[in-house]
From Swiss-Prot:
Function per UniProt: Binds to sialic acid-containing receptors on the cell surface, bringing about the attachment of the virus particle to the cell. This attachment induces virion internalization of about two third of the virus particles through clathrin-dependent endocytosis and about one third through a clathrin- and caveolin-independent pathway. Plays a major role in the determination of host range restriction and virulence. Class I viral fusion protein.
Keyword GTP-binding set for record: no
Gene that encodes the chain: HA
SUPFAM superfamilies cross-referenced by the UniProt entry: Influenza hemagglutinin (stalk), Viral protein domain
Entry protein name: Hemagglutinin
Note: Major glycoprotein, comprises over 80% of the envelope proteins present in virus particle.
Organism, as annotated: Influenza A virus (strain A/Swine/Ukkel/1/1984 H3N2)
Residue numbers on the Extracellular membrane side: 17-530
Amino acid sequence: MKTLIALSYIFCLVLGQDLPGNGNSTATLCLGHHAVPNGTLVKTITDDQIEVTNATELVQNFSMDKICNNPHRILDGANCTLIDALLGDPHCDDFQNEKWDLFVERSKAFSNCYPYDVPDYTSLRSLIASSGTLEFINEDFNWTGVTQNGGSNACKRGPDSSFFSRLNWLYKSGNTYPMLNVTMPNSDNFDKLYIWGVHHPSTAREQTNLYVQASGKVTVSTKRSQQTIIPNIGSRPWVRGLSSRISIYWTIVKPGDILVINSNGNLIAPRGYFKMHTGRSSIMRSDAPIDTCSSECITPNGSIPNDKPFQNVNKITYGACPKYVKQNTLKLATGMRNIPEKQTRGIFGAIAGFIENGWEGMVDGWYGFRHQNSEGTGQAADLKSTQAAIDQINGKLNRVIEKTNEKFHQIEKEFSGVEGRIQDLEKYVEDTKIDLWSYNAELLVALENQHTIDLTDSEMNKLFEKTRRQLRENAEDMGNGCFKIYHKCDNACIESIRNGTYDHNEYRDEALNNRFQIKGVELKSGYKDWILWISFAISCFLLCVVLLGFIMWACQKGNIRCNICI
């Protein structure tokens, strides 16, 4: 019993000791940063996954499923390909003299005129697309001795047989087809594009019926180039009731140059020229609908916002677009390292500083103070250090966007079958570029995240050191981001520490006196906890012993009977 009384006395003495921050002559001031219950994982140079309070997604991985008609001028090809619109297919007459920033070709587009081929289809398509216009100027060519404006039932304009509106099909007049020699100088100050063709009859009889000669020849020349085409007579697969074909060619005539056309048959002559423009217009294959909205960046999937530096929607883009990368997600840290707050603070509910954990619920700043003094507890943010961190983090996203956004469009790459090896090489180069950009993007984001975390940690340390320099010997660093202040420090005193007007000399004598008095009797918190738990355990043990002794004594006296049945 004496032991029990002694342990109880020790327990009471321990509880009676003044705890840091609980007495009238001391106070506790802790520094900390805000935290959230569930942070965001980001990647840094040193860590694959580190939790931060805030992060911004840098990869745009979905489109609007529609193409915006602003600020770019979009021309919907509908049922027409760009080449059909160029040649003047009857069902594409609405496209004459049209202009565009982006010509959108649809999968439903079809040709509905004389069957033709373009030996270098992709180059012509790209040339017209980049010009951004179908502006056409008619010219008076002198085709003496032949019949003009040939037509076909395979190319109807309304109920009548017709032909491509930008081409002039020449055939014999009477029973003659003389040698044609026509010149057309370019006296203007811009490039002129002439489209012409060669007719390939399906039989020798068709050849002589149209052109008299058994074999024709077409030569088109400028000072810089010459093309000579001999028709290839023979049957081909039937298309719209015809087994003959037309091959389409083009010639660019520079200012001061001259166009010369020589032919003794099979010529599909130009009616004029297309005025060439230089610009950043382009063409894209897409079935996304065109709608009234605004977006700088367009992909075949639809328009996408360009407020992120990277995108994973499509390699092919037009406009000011995010850089294409392989990653579906890259997160940029825009907050500090997140250490969720511990819900329990030990047996006495003490406050803790940033070294132990962050503080949830601190919404008015990133860094701040918590205190316990004779007037109670309180919390306030430190706006200066918060603003210093925010100022350095703000603009990170914009700087990354500036470094990575495409200023030009990434066009479709197409090659003919003859250029298969070039196509393979181009694909390899494009894939390598994407791999490099994907790696660079990941490295760039990891570096920025490392910098953000280091700088936010640095601001916390700066605030802690600033507070330490103010308090000097008037307080003791408790090792957890808190200071034990050895003098009476009311709310006004705490506020002076926060705003940097604290005068340590004013409290120096009181602090030294209290420090010596408290140190003389204070048990270190670690030993105090041990004594508390040990005394509690022994007290419980002795209580059990006393209770068991009482039961045995009662059994001996007959006051308690215990029956054991088997």
